Curated annotation (Swiss-Prot):
Residues carrying Phosphoserine: 1051
Gene Ontology CC, one term: DNA-directed RNA polymerase complex
Source organism of this protein record: Pongo abelii
Name of the protein: DNA-directed RNA polymerase I subunit RPA2
EC numbers on record: 2.7.7.6
Localization in the cell: Nucleus, Nucleolus; Chromosome
């Protein structure tokens, strides 16, 4: 993570040179570094998880011990290895490695084999090591385990991938899946919180507490809280296997160290030696322990082990002390390795809790980015893998017990290898997690949610694809909250989260995106040398005594470890020295270290201290360090204590410490593609961030190798004439999303009201915004037959009259063939019976067969049973299709206007689009007006203008700049021209604003949404028309439609007709006397009578037939009456 290398060579301005370069389209020697950076957090976190992290996770799994035939058996996982994806052993093939393109095409999972070395021992004596296959786990594309790792673009193309393939996703059943980055509490940092809900946890509880999200090196996480009680004591709260436990703090402190009560008392009151209330509270906490007869550490451990062992599932031969040690290792400050460190951390948390309760320190905001980090894909993968490895050990014990019940099992290697195969397979749990995004865990992994962890990385267009890897979600549980505090954009997020790139609907403020310069720390470094460096700089070790009183010293914490104390006069100098070492790469201080000095203010503010963070999963961003003249990575917490300038004129000597690399560094990658976004109203930029991801563009270059369910393609994309410099930085011309259009702002017809727009029919005929949709269908004949039967293969019976030369000899359609509704689609044969089956094309939309891929099974031994047919559906713009500019100005195509009736300029130029001028005043999208002038001047002068935000100001006006360029080309300074009516040929009196604007066609098309039905299928139960466009269902007549008819006074006829006659009208027989719908039954006539002519109903309750009448009622009412009768509820009707 080099903070200085990435942003040094930003393009000074956009250019069209690369489009005219003869080498354009030839693969580079190396991939574009800027694009690879976008997925680096995903890829590098996974690399750490499957290499260093996997080794640490295996070491952290305790040996699994149990009793078997009066012997103590223990299993220990010594090592685990994940291998790159390969074909199964025994497969005959040239290439052993499996590549992602094959898994996409065959709709299978890109996965590697997980093997582990299991050591087994009897009564503590090692008996050997068994190498065991545990299952398959998904492999992230472009990670070190992927077969595409470090391949140059030419080699990637040869393996049917994009030249700029970025990776960062998994392939599950042929679908690309991304593990979503979630907001998590900052690890190993005590956060003071006030929550009224905590009062309900028990008698005497208050709303004050200190919470800590403890995370180990292998990312195992546990949440822990300290609660303040009304009597001044403190209760420790932790979670074990999703169960909440409470422990008085005194017991925890006494169990961790063998200190005397006086030493514990002295540690807890540091800095507040004269506070009588604190002294009494600490004395009371220690007195509670003494009252239980626990005066020594051993007695406390024995007491806690006896209380908790029933929940810990430890072996019976463990003494109570060992059970208590197991509890503290798994639940209390798990990020700390020694009990002494845990003791000092709990003391610090207690002091902070008392400061919060007494109003000496303010609460930390858990919704602020200062107290947050992100959950990376590698972190979730490693936590889940560790839990499943522990679960596998437990399943071996269960398999032992089952085997022992049936036969006499002896302990030897051969028997163990057989029993190991009976353990749980890790393949299905991983595939379930990635396929559904739902977490099945016994511990919860320290997460706040168990659903929505994975999303599909759909390639609707390249912008949408990029956004998946920069998205950060607050969490699914927060979406249900009624409060808006979690959605607010706080000042602390400046430079880390984009202020405009968030949805405008339900997930607004919950689904955010990282800025273009923001990075996620993924590397883990050992910090063993830093404590010694701190002591050399003047920090007093934790077991020493500072020269001044503790009230005038700051506590010093390094990654959640209490290192010592530092004099408040020395602290600023030490923080500056550490910052120098960090920027200059000296003293082995990592460049992503966060140095935070929270000063004493004498007022209720943040709890003071010197905090150092080097842990992964934090957000950092580069800024210019003005003192050293170099770039520095700063974190979210240290930023709030800095003075960061944006422009040069904002720098004040002695006050300003840092400066932004460029003004638009606060925007996300997608928001940086909006031209002149600083001239638009903020909501319009938000809309464009969303609509840019819905654009029908050019998402990839390997259409012939893809088997996605649906892909969009714009046939005639263009490079924008006006674009920000970041557009070129990310080489977006390789994946264009729109077309340069000549737009005239004029009310010319009545068809352009309410954001509608007129398109020149001649432009449409020349290919304006033409597109296609690629749909793929995966056909597997093995799903159509019974288990074990393999007699079905694709093919056709010669001379079959149903096919009529529509299909090839292999039973599949010809590539390039046009398909219509009812045409033969494919044919297959039963080899046993010789029977032929023909399936027909069922879609109402005509298509062209674009591609057919023949697939096989994992071993390559499958018969001709599986194909993937890709169809191309032409989708040229039609009335009702949606378009938008890059400024959130969306509208639908309302009319294709003949070119001879369109207005034209003096030079004979006819605009492509007529835009209603009423769309500007309320939307205030001045950026679109500037883009129109800039695009016009760019076309006239053969230039490509820079539309990067914040380059123009009131002093340096964009209107002046582009107006002068238009003037130099002989056009009006303000971008207006005289137009002539295409109908009358007369000159229009008003000056019309006309220019070039880059327009996008969105994926919302009438062809996908229109629905028409007269009569059709009905629901079997309610007899009402079924809903759904795919099944030719009815159109929903909802509450708004009902209210509209009521308001028009047509309830008697139209409303009755819609909701009754056209829905589920039925004629029912009712007894007028008893009012029952269920009692009238049809009497069976004598055999000699006609059953149709002599239909006679009789009331079974009244035993009369002259009281039967017919009424028209909804059929669903009859069903409702029958349901109530089943519940012993009678419905009586008054028939008038």
């Amino acid at each position: 993570m080099d903070p200085g290398s990435r942003w040094r060579n930003l393009p000074s301005g956009p250019s069209l040179k690369h489009l005219t370069d003869p080498s354009y389209g030839i693969p580079r020697e190396q991939q574009k570094a800027a694009l690879q950076e976008l997925t680096r957090a995903h890829v590098e976190s996974f690399n750490y998880a499957v290499h260093e992290g996997l080794g640490l996770a295996v070491q952290a799994i305790p040996p699994f011990e149990f009793a078997f035939k009066d012997e103590r058996i223990s299993f220990t996982i010594l090592d685990a290895v994940i291998s790159p994806p390969t074909v199964p052993k025994g497969t005959i093939c040239k290439e052993v490695s499996v590549y992602p393109a094959e898994c996409r095409g065959r709709r299978c999972t890109y996965r590697g084999k997980l093997t582990a070395d299991i050591s087994w021992a009897v009564n503590g004596i090692s008996k050997g090591i068994i190498k065991q296959f545990l299952g398959y786990v998904p492999i992230m594309v472009k990670s070190k385990l992927c077969n595409l790792y470090n391949l140059p673009p030419q080699a990637l193309i040869e393996h049917h991938e994009e030249a700029e393939e970025m990776g960062g996703y998994f392939i599950i059943n042929g679908i690309e899946k991304v593990i979503r980055m979630l907001i998590m509490p900052r690890r190993n940092f005590p956060i003071a919180m006030v929550r009224p809900k905590w009062k309900t946890r028990g008698p005497g509880y208050t709303h004050y507490g200190v919470s800590m999200h403890c995370v180990r090196e292998e990312h195992s996480a546990v949440n822990m809280n300290l609660h303040y009680l009304e009597n001044g004591t403190v209760m420790l709260n932790f979670i074990y296997r999703k169960e909440l436990f409470f422990l008085p703090l005194g017991f925890a402190l006494k169990a961790l160290v063998s200190f005397s009560d006086y030493q514990i008392f002295q540690e807890l009151i540091k800095g507040k030696e004269d506070d009588s209330f604190l002294r009494n509270s600490v004395s009371q906490m220690l007195r509670i322990v003494m009252e239980e007869g626990c005066s020594t550490q051993k007695q406390v451990l024995n007491y806690l082990g006896e209380c908790f062992r029933v929940k810990l599932n430890v072996p019976d031969w463990y003494p109570n002390e060992q059970a208590a040690e197991f509890l503290f290792n798994q639940c209390i400050c798990i990020h700390l390795k020694s009990n002494t460190e845990k003791f000092y951390m709990l003391c610090l948390m207690t002091r902070k809790l008392f400061a919060l309760a007494k109003g000496e320190c303010m609460e930390d905001n858990p919704d602020s980015l200062v107290n947050q980090e992100v959950l990376t894909p590698g972190q979730l993968f490693l936590m889940f893998l560790k839990e499943k490895l522990e679960g596998w050990l437990v399943s071996i014990k269960i398999a032992f017990d089952k085997k022992a019940q049936k036969t006499n099992v002896s302990m030897n290697t051969d028997n163990l290898m057989r029993i190991f195969t009976m353990g749980i397979d890790l393949t299905k749990p991983f595939e379930y997690l990635f396929a559904t995004g739902n977490l099945r865990s016994k511990t919860g992994l320290g997460l706040l949610q168990d659903s929505g962890l994975c999303v599909v990385a759909d390639k609707l267009n390249f912008i949408r694809y990029l956004s998946h890897f920069r998205c950060v979600h607050r969490g699914a549980d927060f979406a249900k909250m009624r409060t808006t505090t979690v959605r607010r954009l706080l000042p602390e997020s400046w430079g880390f989260l984009c202020p405009v790139h968030t949805p405008d609907g339900e997930p607004c403020g919950l689904m955010n995106h990282l800025t273009a310069v923001c990075e996620v720390v993924t590397q883990f470094v050992y910090t063993a040398s830093i404590p010694a460096l701190l002591c050399n700089l003047g920090v007093t070790p934790i077991d020493g005594a500072p020269h001044r009183s503790y009230s005038e010293c700051y506590p010093v914490l390094l990654d959640g470890v209490m290192v010592g104390w530092v004099d408040k006069e020395l602290a600023p100098g030490i923080a500056d020295s550490l910052r120098h070492f960090k920027v200059l790469r000296e003293k082995r201080i990592p460049p992503w270290t966060e140095v935070v000095l929270i000063p004493m203010t004498g007022k209720p503010s943040l709890y003071p201290g010197l905090f150092l963070f080097t842990t992964p999963c934090r957000l950092v961003r580069p800024v210019q360090n003005l003192e050293l003249g170099k770039e520095e990575l700063i974190g979210t917490m240290e930023q709030i204590f800095m003075n960061v300038a944006i422009f040069e004129d904002e720098v004040f000597a002695g006050v300003t410490t840092h400066q932004e690399l460029f003004p638009h560094s606060l925007l996300s990658v997608i928001a940086n593609f909006i031209p002149f976004s600083d001239h638009n109203q903020s909501p319009r930029n938000m809309y464009q961030c969303q609509m840019g991801k819905q654009t029908m563009g050019f998402p990839l270059l390997t259409y012939q190798d893809r088997s996605d369910n649906k892909l969009y393609r714009l046939q005639t994309p263009q490079s924008p004439l006006v674009r920000p410099s970041m557009y070129d930085y990310y080489d977006m011309d390789n994946y264009p999303i729109g077309t340069n259009a000549i737009v005239a702002v004029i009310s010319y017809t009545g068809y352009d009201m309410e954001d509608a727009m007129i398109v020149n029919k001649a432009s449409w005929e020349r290919g304006f915004a033409h597109g296609s949709v690629y749909k793929s269908e995966f056909i597997d004949l093995s799903e159509k037959i019974k288990q074990g039967d393999s007699s079905l293969v694709f093919g056709m019976k010669p001379g079959d009259p149903r096919i009529l030369q529509k299909l090839d000899d292999d039973g599949l359609p010809f590539i390039g063939a046009k398909l219509q509704y009812g045409d033969p689609y494919y044919s297959y044969l039963n080899l046993n019976t010789g029977e032929s089956f023909v399936m027909y094309y069922k879609s109402k939309e005509n298509c062209v067969v674009d591609n057919i891929k023949v697939c096989s099974n994992d071993t390559g031994s499958g018969k001709f049973k599986c194909v993937c047919i890709t169809m191309r559906v032409p989708r040229n713009p039609t009335i009702g299709d949606k378009f938008a500019s890059r400024h959130g100005q969306k509208g639908i195509l309302s009319r294709l206007w003949p070119a001879e009736d369109m207005p034209f300029t003096e030079s004979g130029m006819v605009p492509d689009i007529l835009f209603n001028p009423h769309g500007f005043p309320s939307r205030m999208t001045i950026g679109m007006l500037i883009e129109s002038m800039a695009g016009k001047s760019a076309a006239l002068h053969g230039l490509c203008h820079d539309a990067t935000p914040f380059i123009f100001s009131e002093e340096n006006s964009a209107l002046e700049y582009f107006g002068e360029m238009l003037k130099a080309a002989g056009y009006n300074f303000y971008g207006t021209e005289r137009l002539y009516s295409g109908i009358s040929g007369l000159e229009l009196e008003a000056d019309i604003f006309i220019g070039v604007v880059y327009y996008q066609r969105l994926r919302h098309m009438v062809s996908d949404k229109f629905q028409v039905r007269t009569t059709g299928a009905r629901d079997r139960v309610t007899n009402q028309p079924i809903g759904g466009r795919n099944v030719q269902g009815g159109i929903r007549f909802g509450e708004m439609e009902r209210d509209a008819l009521l308001a028009h006074g047509t309830s008697f006829f139209l409303l009755h007709d819609r909701l009754f006659n056209c829905s589920d009208r039925s004629v029912a027989h009712v007894c007028v006397k008893c009012g029952s719908l269920l009692s009238p039954l049809l009497e069976k006539p004598p055999p000699s009578w006609s059953a149709m002519r002599n239909r006679k109903y009789n009331c079974t309750l009244c035993n009369r037939s002259d009281t039967i009448d017919t009424v028209s009622v909804p059929y669903v009412f009859r069903y409702f009456v029958a349901e109530l009768a089943a519940m012993n509820i009678k419905v009586k009707l008054d028939v008038v």
